[in-house]
């Protein structure tokens, strides 16, 4: 009798362990790796539409608000959030920048995380202009680079790497209208999410807000 009782306890314990394991697996948090195949074809350059899990942000070299050359190597091994803007924009940019400042405050003490904002009007947004803009907005130089550079290269990386603008006619290749998207990039240069840069915490079906972005950044930070 005692033997059967011990056996019953063993099986009950085993079932509890199995149940907990299954529950943990079903509820384990994951964050997708986003590739060109996963994105609306209108937002993907035809040259990269076929790329799957090998897709990463391409090498780049731009100049930041301090006149320093910034390359992909400065972001290697870091989690970062990228967006596209221009300093004289009077529509969505002011709100996007305010929200990036909000995000900067959330991640300023996390050494694993940085920010990267690309000007889509690089000829107008010179180093001097970006420096003034950065001071006005309270940019922390060690955390957030506002970059300018070759217009074609900026537009190319927006279309082929970050997948954030519609591909127009050939003659419109370098006439980009930037979106409100914030792009989350992981330590390996892979896209892990798109977020509405105008929305901090409002729930909108089919899109992620910036509060969710902070949560996803924390998730990636803990995994590293």
Where are these regions (language model features)?
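Short, small/polar residue-rich loop motifs at catalytic or cofactor-binding pockets
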Residues: 55-57, 78-79, 177-179
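Hydrophobic beta-strand positions
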Residues: 61-62, 184
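Structural microenvironment flanking redox-active thiols in thiol-disulfide oxidoreductases
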Residues: 97-157
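Thiol-/selenol-based redox modules, centered on thioredoxin-like
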Residues: 170-224
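Structural micro-motif
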Residues: 144, 155, 161-167, 177-183
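N-terminal targeting signals for export/organelle localization
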Residues: 1-57, 224
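Periplasmic c-type cytochrome electron-transfer domains
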Residues: 31-40, 48, 145-152, 179-181, ...
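Short active-site neighborhood of thiol/selenol oxidoreductases, capturing the structured segment around
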Residues: 70-100, 115-116
């Amino acid at each position: 009798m005692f033997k059967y009782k011990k056996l019953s306890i063993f099986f009950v314990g085993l079932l509890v362990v199995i149940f907990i394991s299954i529950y943990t697996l079903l509820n384990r948090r994951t964050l997708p790796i986003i590739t060109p195949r996963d994105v609306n074809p209108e937002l993907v350059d035809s040259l990269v539409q076929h790329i799957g899990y090998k897709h990463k942000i391409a090498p780049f070299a731009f100049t930041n608000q301090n006149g320093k050359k910034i390359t992909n190597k400065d972001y290697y091994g870091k989690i970062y959030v990228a967006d596209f803007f221009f300093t004289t924009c009077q529509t969505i940019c002011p709100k996007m920048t305010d929200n990036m400042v909000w995000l900067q405050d959330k991640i300023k003490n996390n050494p694993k995380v940085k920010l990267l904002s690309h000007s889509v009007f690089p000829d107008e947004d010179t180093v001097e202009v970006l420096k003034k803009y950065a001071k006005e907005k309270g940019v922390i130089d060690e955390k957030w680079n506002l970059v300018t550079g070759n217009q074609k290269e900026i537009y190319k990386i927006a279309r082929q790497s970050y997948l954030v603008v519609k591909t127009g006619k050939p003659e419109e290749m370098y006439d980009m209208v930037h979106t409100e998207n914030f792009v989350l990039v992981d330590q390996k240069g892979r896209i892990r999410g798109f977020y509405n840069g105008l929305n901090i915490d409002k729930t909108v079906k089919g899109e992620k807000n910036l509060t969710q972005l902070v949560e996803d950044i924390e998730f990636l930070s803990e995994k590293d």
